[in-house]
Each structure stands twice: as C-alpha cells, then as structure tokens.
C-alpha cells in the first residue's frame, strides 16, 4: 500500500491501517474456527426436559437431535394427556437447547470482545 502524505508531510495511511486489517482478518479467522469447533461439539452436549411431574422425560443434544424419550407407564391409557405432555416436553427441551447454545456461543464471543453476537 502506497503511503500518502498530506500538505504538512504527515502520513495519511499505510502501516497502521494495514496492520489493523491484518489483525482483524486473523481475529475473524480465529473466531470462525472457534465457532466451527463449537458447532461440532453441540452433538456431545445433552439437555433434558421433564414434564408432567416426571411422567415424560426427553433428552436431546444441542445439535437438535432427540436421543431419548421416557414415558411413564400410567400414560399408556391416556393418549390425550400423553400427546400434550410430549408437545410440552419437546417445546421445553428445544428452549433449553437454544439457551445452552447461546450460553456456549457467548463464551466465545466474549473472548473476542464481541458482546451480543448471538
């Protein structure tokens, strides 16, 4: 990059701007790498939701995959209640997944001084 001089002979560009751009590009690359690693780790992070006093329990991973659903034997005869509890449980586990994903992402963005990215 060619340095430009003002009327007073002071530099108007060049070195500092180039360094800032290189530093920013490096930081952006590191941030993307950390985010990719985090996305990959989400398959290992589990969250659990229990509804109906424990009658339905759902376990899912933060990559939004359901791993297990446990249903109390007493619900076998009450289809409507079972359906309502499954819906409530799925909604709750999805909310917990999103909250956990935001918490994990926040840890990374704080390292880079980028609050509120997620």
Swiss-Prot record:
Described function: Binds to DNA and alters its conformation. May be involved in regulation of gene expression, nucleoid organization and DNA protection.
Pfam families: YbaB_DNA_bd
One GO MF term attached to the UniProt entry: DNA binding
UniProt-listed NCBIfam families: DNA_YbaB_EbfC
Protein name: Nucleoid-associated protein Tpet_0244
Domain of life where this protein originates: Bacteria
GO cellular component, one term: bacterial nucleoid
Keyword Cytoplasm: yes
Keyword set, alphabetical order: Cytoplasm, DNA-binding
Oligomeric form and interacting partners: Homodimer.
Natural source organism: Thermotoga petrophila (strain ATCC BAA-488 / DSM 13995 / JCM 10881 / RKU-1)
Keyword set includes Cytoplasm: yes
Localization: Cytoplasm, Nucleoid
Chief location: cytoplasm
Protein family according to the UniProt entry: Belongs to the YbaB/EbfC family.
